Design a protein with these regions (language model features):
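N-terminal "domain-start" segment that seeds a small globular fold
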Residues: 13-40, 63-67, 172-192
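The canonical Cys-X-X-Cys-His
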Residues: 57-61, 148, 201, 205-215, ...
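Electrostatic cytochrome c docking/interface patches
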Residues: 176-204, 221, 300
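Short, internal strand/loop/helix patches
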Residues: 102-145, 250, 254-261, 266
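Short active-site neighborhood of thiol/selenol oxidoreductases, capturing the structured segment around
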Residues: 38-64, 68
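Structural microenvironment flanking redox-active thiols in thiol-disulfide oxidoreductases
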Residues: 65-116, 120-123, 233
Length: 303
């Protein structure tokens, strides 16, 4: 039975599924051109985090990679030491090692995270055995789901999670899955103080945009969005936020210029509704205004 059959939620895999007799030991090539074998070199005895990507993806892949880049920074030097990140291309005909290396650099990937390519039939087999393939893949714009497989091969425990979840949540999920009760304690909710209500625009920005953008804190993978609602035509901005892939495909000069300036990183189409865009743009506008507004006299930021 494939792992996919028991991976409907974040739960351990069935006992007896896994090991050298289950996972293919096929050769793959890293972004540095090194040939490795999937089971012997990448899985055996290791704690791993695996997802599927391809570099020409205009859907969830850029967000997946940006999110995992944030998670990698949160996990620090454990990535590559006792936790291993693997992103496997499902478009090996295009995604050569050189292409994958350039793609990783765009997202500021640190050492310890491998981007892998190989034969298409081998990658399909890996995807199926990991439980990362789905009957809905063909209907998906990306050809796959934005899923993440977290696994401890030594104990044959596996958990599937969204690859575009909150990075702090993902990092803590990974640590607790691998470390159990030995994981470092986190701050108590009692110490957090009062919580403010989160509006739709703020929720969308923090859940969909912060992996690649800031407002007033400089460029990341994409541009700083400070004053973007003032600098860009409102109708153009709304259309671009809703369907950036379509605007770029039409050869729009602003979209083309942004694409070139930010190292050909494709802004993902996040399937935002008109209502989503109508909430997101005012939030960005308000945040820009708050940054521009002088702090009250006597406040720490005014001193």
């Amino acid at each position: 039975m494939a792992i996919a059959a028991v991976m409907l939620g974040p739960a351990p895999a069935m006992a007896g599924v896994g090991g050298s007799g289950y996972f293919p030991n096929v050769p793959l090539t890293t972004q540095d051109g090194k040939v490795v074998h999937f089971y012997d070199d990448l899985l055996k005895g290791k704690s791993v985090v695996i997802n599927l990507i391809y570099t020409q993806c205009s859907g969830s892949c850029p967000l997946e990679t940006a999110r995992l880049s944030q998670v990698q920074r949160l996990l620090g030097d454990r990535v590559g030491k006792d936790i291993f990140f693997y992103s496997i291309s499902i478009d090996p005909a295009h995604d050569t090692p050189e292409t994958l290396k350039a793609y990783a650099a765009k997202f500021h990937v640190q050492p310890g995270w491998l981007f892998l390519t190989g034969k298409k039939e081998d990658i399909k087999r890996i995807s199926k055995q990991l439980g990362l393939s789905s009957v809905t893949d063909a209907a998906s714009l990306d050809g796959h789901q934005p899923a993440l497989m977290i696994g401890k091969e030594a104990t044959n425990e596996w958990m599937r999670n969204s690859a575009v979840d909150n990075p702090q949540f993902l990092a803590m999920t990974i640590l607790h899955f691998f470390d159990g009760y030995n994981a470092k304690p986190v701050q108590s909710y009692a110490d957090m103080g009062p919580l403010h209500g989160v509006g739709r625009g703020e929720y969308l920005f923090k859940s969909r945009c912060t992996a690649c953008h800031t407002i007033g804190k400089g460029d990341r993978v994409g541009p700083d969005l400070l004053n973007v609602t003032r600098l860009r035509d409102r109708a153009w901005l709304a259309r671009y936020v809703a369907a950036p892939d379509r605007v770029l495909a039409e050869g729009d000069p602003i979209a083309m210029k942004l694409f070139a300036r930010y190292r050909n990183v494709r802004m993902p189409n996040l399937r935002l509704s008109t209502e989503d865009v109508d909430a997101l743009l005012p939030y960005m506008e308000q945040q820009s205004q708050d940054i521009a507004r002088p702090a009250p006299k006597g406040s720490p930021s005014a001193q």
